[in-house]
């Protein structure tokens, strides 16, 4: 499976669910993570499309067929209207994404992916580009889609295929 195929299979549906969830807007407003919700929703989307998606096989968040997917939510410390200003350890969040990539690389899955939601942020934010680069250097390729939670809080969802020939 390619990153484009997984992106096409999941991202429109998950973005619709994010944008229509008043509960997630509360999370975004407080910069709170929602990985458990994301896991349930991704499995629901895949199951409705005929995939036998399961949670926590070999400690991997979501898997089906030969595909393993790790999920993360990355709450940033960048100031935005409608979002509480708090200190968030973005470096630790990025390290957590890369740890999940490292865990997945050592599995038997043929196709290994990371899907992560970053918020509040826009894809072209200069501060974010540095942090994103620390993740994407571990990816063969990736796609993204920018969206807004209700309340005009910006977020970006990324879907990347993990490079198997990393140094």
Which residues does each predicted region cover?
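Hydrophobic, Leu/Ile/Phe/Ala-enriched alpha-helical segments that form helix-helix packing faces
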Residues: 10, 14, 18, 42, ...
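Surface-exposed cleft-lining segments at the edges of enzyme active sites
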Residues: 25-31, 78-93
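Conserved catalytic cores of phosphodiester-cleaving nucleases, focusing on short active-site segments
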Residues: 62-87, 104
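Short, charged, amphipathic alpha-helix that recurs within catalytic cores of restriction-modification
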Residues: 85-114, 124-127
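Domain-level recognition of nuclease-like catalytic cores that cleave nucleotide substrates
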Residues: 113-167
